[in-house]
Amino acid sequence: MPSPIHVIGGGLSGAEAAWQIAKAGIPVILHEMRPDRSTPAHHSADLAELVCSNSFRADDAESSAIGILHREMRRLDSLILQAADCNRLPAGGALAVDRQGFAAFVTAAIKASPLITLVRGEVTEIPADWDQIIIATGPLTSETLAAHIKALTGEDDLAFFDAIAPVVYRDSIDMTKAWFQSRYDKVGPGGNGADYINCPLDKEQYQAFVEGLIQGEKISFKEWEGTPYFNGCLPIEIMAERGPETLRHGPMKPVGLTNAHAPTVKPYAIVQLRQDNALGTLYNMVGFQTKLKHAEQIALFRTIPGLEQARFARLGGLHRNIFLNTPKVLDMRLRLKADPRLRFAGQITGCEGYVESAGIGLLVGRMAACERLGESFVPPPTTTALGALLNHITAGHIETIDAGPRSFQPMNVNFGLFPPLTEKIVSPEGKRLRGPEKDQLKKRLLSQRAERDLEAWCTAPTCGPTPLAAE
C-alpha cells in the first residue's frame, strides 16, 4: 500500500482531490479545521459547504464554457458533479443544488471511502515528514496557515483581496470607434507601441459616465471581508466620488493618445483595455475594478464608445480571496517551486468559481496520484475546459505589458481561454455568418472540439491513474 497523501482543506477542491487520489488506490488523509475552528462564512461542519451561491451556473455544454467543464468533470468521475446532479434543484438551464443535501452527499462519500481518513483540526504549518501535500484551503485560509504559506512563497506572492477589472471579449469591441495605441506610442517589454485598445469619450459622455458610476447600485462587502480599500486599488466609483475630474487624471486620462479615426479631435477622456491572456482573445478594462452590481456594470460600460456590443468574460469586483501568484511560484504541475512536496488546488491557485476550483482539485488529485505511483501524467489539451483553465493559471497570463510587472488575477472558465478555431466559421452551405449566429456556431464548434479532444485524452495512459473497479 502506498504511503498516504495529505490534503489540507475539505472544500470542493480538497474533497475532489482526495476522491480522485482514493479512486487510484492510494490512501489519503484529508484535514479539515471545521468544526474545531470555523470561519465567519461557514455554518456547518460538512465538507464542501457552499458559502455563497447555490448555483454551478449554466449546464449547457453547447453554448457555455462552464457547461463544457461540467461535462468534462462528469466524464472523469467527479465527486462534486455527482453530488450536484444528485441534489439538483429546478433552475432552468442552470445547475443549482440543495446546499445541505449537496454538502451531506460529499461528506458521506468521503467518510464511506475506505482509503480516506478525515481528520478534524487546524493545520498551522507543514510537518517535515509529510512527503506529498495538497493545500486546498480556499479564500478563507486561516491566518496561521496563510502566514506559513506566505513565508514559503514570499510576501509579495500571496494576495488577500481580488481587485478585479472587467474583461471583454476582443471580438466584441467595435474597432471602427476604438483603436490600438500605447500612451505616447511607448514600446515596453513584449510590446509594439500599440498594446492597448482605446475608447474615446467626449465631455458629455464622460460626465454621464461619471454620474452613472456614482449613482449606480453597489454590492456591499460581507461583514467578514472588511473594507480593503487602498489607494493603489480603489474601486473606480470611489475615485469618481472624489471629484468630477478625478478619473480624467487617473485611469481615463486622455494624454499621449491620438484617435486614429479622428486625429484632429482630442478626446475628453479615454478608456483603455489591455490584453489579458496570451491568446489575445480577452482584454481587461484598465483601472476599472468596481463594486457596482453586475447588471449596472453591463449597462454602464456599454455606454462607452466601442463597447456598445461588448460581451464580458468577467465583470469587476473587489472581495477577499487569498490566492497565489501561481505562474511565478508554482510549476506546470501546480507544485511549489521552492518545495515540490507541496501542491496547491482550488481558488488559492487563482481559479474563480465553485466548479473551476473543483476542476483544478480533480487535476491535482490525479497529478499527485500519478506521482505517488511513479506514472506519467500529461495535462488535458488546452482545447478542453480543464486544459484551458490549467493553462491560464500556469502560463496563459501576460507577465509584462509595459514597464512594470503585471499582476496575476483569478479567472472563471470562459471561451476566451480556449485556443481559437482553425477553421472558418461558416454555415453548412458555406455562407459567412455574422453577429449572434456566428457567435452561437463558434461556441458549438469549440464545444465539439473540446469533447473530441477530451475523449482522446481520456483514452491515453497518461491522463491519470486507472481508477479502482470498486471501493
From Swiss-Prot:
The keyword Repeat does not apply. FAD binds at G9, G10, G11, L12, S13, G14. It comes from the Bacteria. Keywords: Cytoplasm, FAD, Flavoprotein, Methyltransferase, NAD, NADP, Transferase, tRNA processing. Signal peptide: none annotated. InterPro entries: FAD/NAD-bd_sf (IPR036188), MnmG-rel (IPR002218), MnmG_N (IPR040131), TrmFO (IPR004417). It is an enzyme of class 2 (transferase). It catalyses: uridine(54) in tRNA + (6R)-5,10-methylene-5,6,7,8-tetrahydrofolate + NADH + H(+) = 5-methyluridine(54) in tRNA + (6S)-5,6,7,8-tetrahydrofolate + NAD(+); uridine(54) in tRNA + (6R)-5,10-methylene-5,6,7,8-tetrahydrofolate + NADPH + H(+) = 5-methyluridine(54) in tRNA + (6S)-5,6,7,8-tetrahydrofolate + NADP(+). Belongs to the MnmG family. TrmFO subfamily. Catalyzes the folate-dependent formation of 5-methyl-uridine at position 54 (M-5-U54) in all tRNAs. This is Methylenetetrahydrofolate--tRNA-(uracil-5-)-methyltransferase TrmFO. It comes from Beijerinckia indica subsp. indica (strain ATCC 9039 / DSM 1715 / NCIMB 8712). The gene is trmFO.
